[in-house]
Amino acid sequence: MAKAIPKKGSRGRIGSRKSIRKIPKGVIHIQASFNNTIVTVTDVRGRVVSWSSAGTCGFRGTRRGTPFAAQTAAANAIRAVVDQGMQRAEVMIKGPGLGRDAALRAIRRSGILLTFVRDVTPMPHNGCRPPKKRRV
């Protein structure tokens, strides 16, 4: 086997490639299902800046769907963007889960000024047949 000849002057990248950019305004998406709550923070163009979920915060199983898990997930996602200088945000809430209000409360407590809160839960215009009711 022939040895690979090292290229001259090919040292690795010295700094990180991405620069931390200031984000004064953003959009916070909360997706609250019965099993989990996912909080995604984007800039106004839709590029993801930070995200967190109840699962990534260490909650497993049925505890992921609790309001406390949603509150922790929202606080983790917001902490990163407050450091980048976010002051104002719009909130889009989707889903029927228990974590809707708890995540919104955690965002309000973070000090970010909310311009508006919008419910974007998809509603069918009598589309697909829903699953049968559970019998426990």
Swiss-Prot record:
Keyword Chloroplast recorded: yes
One example of a Gene Ontology biological process annotation: translation
An annotated GO cellular component: chloroplast
Alphabetically ordered keywords of this record: Chloroplast, Plastid, Ribonucleoprotein, Ribosomal protein, RNA-binding, rRNA-binding
GO molecular function, one term: rRNA binding
Subcellular location: Plastid, Chloroplast
Subunit (UniProt): Part of the 30S ribosomal subunit.
Similarity comment: Belongs to the universal ribosomal protein uS11 family.
The protein, known as: Small ribosomal subunit protein uS11c
Source organism: Guizotia abyssinica
Gene name of this polypeptide: rps11
